[in-house]
Amino acid sequence: MDKFRAEQVISDCKLALSRFDDELIADEFRLNLVLCLALLRAVGHCLQNEFRNGDIIFNKKKNDKIFTDFIKKFRDKILKNYSSNVGWEMVSVVGSNTCSIHYIITEGSYKGKDIRDVITEAINWWEQYILELKQEKYTLQPLIDTEETISDLAQPFLY
């Protein structure tokens, strides 16, 4: 079964999500948040471009709450306004020398949830969607020559 480019984007998003385990703060937190949100939205763009009837396929899912209230809305806010409704806070355990960092959504449908949990939910949503596409045997557009290498695909990003 063909692997979609969108699956590589999901893999990269999982890698970026795992960086939150390093308890990022300040600049590192903001940069990683931008990366995760941009990648989550890029999955949809890749899928639309990979299929001959991409718009028709994507129309089935674009009204799902995780897409409208999180993937699209959060990406738009951070990329178009360079602001977010996610904050981080250090939480220490009383009687212990340990503390942890929580990344909490401060407004909207996901208010009070940890952004890592919602990113995970979005990743799972995309993976389920791709599984459905594979089961329905949608036809990929001939965008990728099987002889292409990763460096060939990366060339446009070097300029």
Annotated model-derived regions:
Residues 1-34, 52-159:
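Acidic, Ser/Thr/Gly/Pro-rich intrinsically disordered interaction regions
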Residues 42-51:
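Extended, well-ordered alpha-helical segments in internal regulatory regions
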